[in-house]
Amino acid sequence: MKKFIAAAALFLMSLSFGDKLSAGNFGILGGANFCTTSMAGIKSESMTQWHAGLSYKMNLPLGFHIQPTLLYNVKGSDFNLSETDFTVGYLEFMASVQWGIDLILFRPFLDVSPYVGYGVNHEGDLSVAWKEFGNPLGYGVGVGGGLDIWRFQLVARYNWDFGQIFKPDQSVSPVIGARFRGVTLSLAYFF
């Protein structure tokens, strides 16, 4: 009888603490991008776009979390060249490394997120130029912070693209070295 009661108590304890001891959680996320483009001699303004995707948050010791994410991320910019705009939709993989202090009700954290992506579509006035001279491979790093509250996660991050938007070509010299950069705000829900 004692063994049965001990086994039942252990089973009930495992049910109540199972969520905290799990290896990780799947989640969905979405948010807004406030992107601009750096081009030599051409002024660009921020353009608001969006991103959405799937994520998995792995819990590690000492307050660390690793959060691989697959997302569709639309980046763009408005140029002061007679109302010219340009957007590229990237399929990106991001490996976010987070460190924060668990304060029971919430967890503030710092975030470093290297990413790599592939441009799958493009729109706007520079679309024809991107089709011919565009560099579909994009990569960079994001740095920011966030807050976990229950199953929700809010993250603000500044992203630097290291890859050029256009391939180096002398016929399109104004766009050589053009890169996206900007702020992303994301809200995630983990199951």
Residue ranges with predicted function:
Residues 15, 54-59, 81, 138-147:
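Generic detector of contiguous secondary-structure segments
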Residues 24, 32, 55-125, 186-191:
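Gram-negative (and chloroplast) outer-membrane scaffold detector with strong preference
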Residues 34-44, 74-90, 118-137, 164-183:
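Flexible, solvent-exposed loop segments that connect beta-strands
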Residues 20-39:
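Short N-terminal segments immediately surrounding and downstream of signal-peptide cleavage
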Residues 26, 48-54, 91-95, 112, ...:
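Hydrophobic, lipid-facing positions within transmembrane beta-strands of outer-membrane proteins
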